[in-house]
Amino acid sequence: MKKFFLIFLLYFLSQLSSLSNERDNKLNQLFIELKVNQSNDAFIVEQEIWKLWSTHPTDMNLTARLEEGAQFVRNQQLSKAIEIFTEVIKLDQNWAEAWNKRATVFYMMGKFKQSQEDIDKVLELEARHFGALAGQGLVNIQLKNYEKAILSYQQVKEIYPSMQSPEIMIRRIEELIKQQTI
């Protein structure tokens, strides 16, 4: 019986690894497409990336909890959203999107340092997370770290060249810097 259980466990773990590799390969391909596609096509690729990020690789219950938290955000129940995202993070500390969702809510609550801490974790797990990088830009604007904000938006442009908001934000930040020196 022990032998059967061990064989089953090894098979199960190999399937999880296979799913993870498949997901990583799909993301890698989408990021290549994101770099070369223009506006409309790139937007479709972006949506596919968000779909993968927002879907837990192995646990649909965590995906459902993340969506529940997102619903609380849409309803402006930010404290409840934080609770749910924190619960999801405790259950899987390696799911970048759970950290990203909580970082977003911390930003919305004006808790910029906590937001940045979560963004750091997102980027540790998924360095190409253009949403977290854009959020990092917003956090740095609030903290008046304008040069860091510009760097964040430049990184977004490297990952997602056809996204227009980074250019707009960089121009706005440059205006803020000019106003400081006047």
Positions of predicted regions on the chain:
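Alpha-helical adaptor scaffolds
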Residues: 59-126, 131
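TPR/TPR-like (Sel1-like) alpha-helical repeat modules
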Residues: 28-38, 141-165, 171, 175
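Alpha-solenoid helical repeat scaffolds
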Residues: 97-101, 131-135, 151, 165-170
